[in-house]
């Protein structure tokens, strides 16, 4: 991956390892979409578009030679720069266990938020429809734990009618889930009751959405396609600091909208 130019950076192997490990730790907790969608790839930096398996016919009916264009989703290329203090990084070699990587950490969070934004809300300029775009798959839900359980049962009933198998996952706004937990009554925890309704699925809380959705995790319905997975490269040196960047190429495809139900509170 020469485009990352890591060998040109004034950083030691230990420093690179610390940077990569810290970024990986944050990505693991902040990439909410990857917790329940299928991840394909990575196919490499040169992978520019993902084929959709269709042809848009553009020739006239009376033409002898018919022709068209293969449909595809172009990959989104993101790049976010940040700077780290070289003296502080050298402290790592001196034995300091907690060097300041706050600039890296903040950039990682913004990149994770961008990827999730595409998954949940789409990106019109790149032809991506996000999960929340399918308003026709919406059901209303009240504000009590009982209302939530009833909405999940209704969602699973719709899945059953459409032939969508499980397991199923509830993706819900973190604050809304906390409020449901505050209002629960009885000796049997709400979390257990929801998990039983989901038939072996799980609950994912996230600040990325305002309401909730129930999705099937049978596989093949929602695809995050990676060209170059999240990587860190070297950009330049600025006196006593080093300028690095995070990059990724990806797109997202909702193959089957019938595998999701939006819950609106």
UniProtKB/Swiss-Prot annotation:
pH note: Optimum pH for protease activity is 7.1. Nanocompartments are stable from pH 4-12, they reversibly disassemble at pH 1 and pH 13.
Top EC category: hydrolase
Cofactor(s) listed in the protein's UniProt record: FMN
A biological process from GO: intracellular iron ion homeostasis
Enzyme Commission number(s) of this protein: 3.4.-.-
UniProt subcellular location: Encapsulin nanocompartment
UniProt cross-references to InterPro entries, sorted A to Z: ENCAP (IPR007544), Encapsulin_nc (IPR051429)
Temperature dependency: Optimum temperature for protease activity is 90-93 degrees Celsius.
Protein origin, superkingdom: Bacteria
Biotechnology comment: Foreign proteins can be targeted to ectopic nanocompartments in E.coli upon coexpression with a construct using the 15 C-terminal residues of Flp (AC Q9WZP3), tested with GFP. There are at most 20 GFP per compartment. Empty nanocompartments can be disassembled by extreme pH or by 7 M guanidine hydrochloride (GuHCl); only reassembly from GuHCl-dissociated compartments allows incorporation of targeted cargo.
A Pfam match: Linocin_M18
Regulation: Proteolysis activated by calcium and cobalt.
GO cellular component, one term: encapsulin nanocompartment
UniProt KW keywords: Encapsulin nanocompartment, Flavoprotein, FMN, Hydrolase, Ion transport, Iron, Iron storage, Iron transport, Protease, Transport
Chain positions covered by the region annotation Pore-forming loop: 184-189
Binding site for FMN: 79-81, 87, 90-94, 235
Subunit and interaction comment: Homomultimeric. This encapsulin nanocompartment is formed by 60 subunits; monomers form 12 pentamers which assemble to form shells. There are 12 pores where the pentamers meet as well as 3-fold axis channels and dimer channels; none are larger than 3-4 Angstroms in diameter. The N-terminus of the protein is inside the shell, the C-terminus is outside. Probably 3, 4 or 5 Flp cargo decamers bind inside the encapulin nanocompartment.
Function in brief: Shell component of a type 1 encapsulin nanocompartment. Assembles into proteinaceous shells 23-24 nm in diameter with 2-2.5 nm thick walls. Cargo protein Flp (ferritin-like protein, probably stores iron) is targeted to the interior via its C-terminal extension; empty intact shells can be isolated in the absence of cargo protein. Fe(2+) may be able to pass though the 5-fold and dimer channels in the protein shell. Protease that exhibits activity toward chymotrypsin and trypsin substrates. Probably does not have antibacterial activity.
Domain-related comment: Has 3 domains; a discontinuous peripheral domain (P, 13-39, 76-133, 221-254), an elongated loop (E, 53-73) and the discontinuous axial domain (A, 137-216 and 259-263). The E-loop forms contacts between two subunits, while the A domain mediates contacts in the 5-fold interface. Pores are formed by residues 184-189, pore size can be modified by mutagenesis.
Name recorded for this polypeptide: Type 1 encapsulin shell protein
Organism of this sequence: Thermotoga maritima (strain ATCC 43589 / DSM 3109 / JCM 10099 / NBRC 100826 / MSB8)
Organism taxonomic ancestry: Bacteria, Thermotogati, Thermotogota, Thermotogae, Thermotogales
